[in-house]
Amino acid sequence: MAHKKGVGSSKNGRESQSKRLGVKIFGGEACKAGNIIVRQRGTEFHPGENIGMGKDHTLFALVDGTVNFKVGREDRRYVSIIPAEATEA
C-alpha cells in the first residue's frame, strides 16, 4: 500500500485568452466612420488616408467609405478609406 495519499495534480489551466487580433474589415468592403479595420500588436499595417490609429495600434475609419489596402515603399502595408462620395460619383 502507498504510504502517502495520492494527490491529483492538474496540468491544465495555463492557456492565455485569445486576443482576437487581425483584419476586421477587408479590402473592398464598405465601412462607417469609427469602425475598427485592423486590431494588431505593433504596426503590421500603417494608417493611410482617412484612417486613425489608437494607442494600441488599432486602425479605425475616420470617414464612411470603402476600405483599400496597398503596399508602399519598403513593403510597408497601408490601409486607407476611399470616401463614400468619391465612390458614388
Curated annotation (Swiss-Prot):
- Single GO cellular component term: cytosolic large ribosomal subunit
Q: Which UniProt keywords apply?
A: Ribonucleoprotein, Ribosomal protein
A single GO BP: translation
Matching entries from SUPFAM superfamilies are given as:
Ribosomal L27 protein-like
- Keyword check for Ribosomal protein, yes or no: yes
A GO term for molecular function = structural constituent of ribosome
* Pfam (any one): Ribosomal_L27
Q: Does the keyword Calcium apply?
A: no
Superkingdom per UniProt: Bacteria
Q: Locate the transmembrane regions by residue number.
A: none
Family (UniProt):
Belongs to the bacterial ribosomal protein bL27 family.
Official protein name in the record: Large ribosomal subunit protein bL27
Organism of this sequence:
Bacteroides fragilis (strain ATCC 25285 / DSM 2151 / CCUG 4856 / JCM 11019 / LMG 10263 / NCTC 9343 / Onslow / VPI 2553 / EN-2)
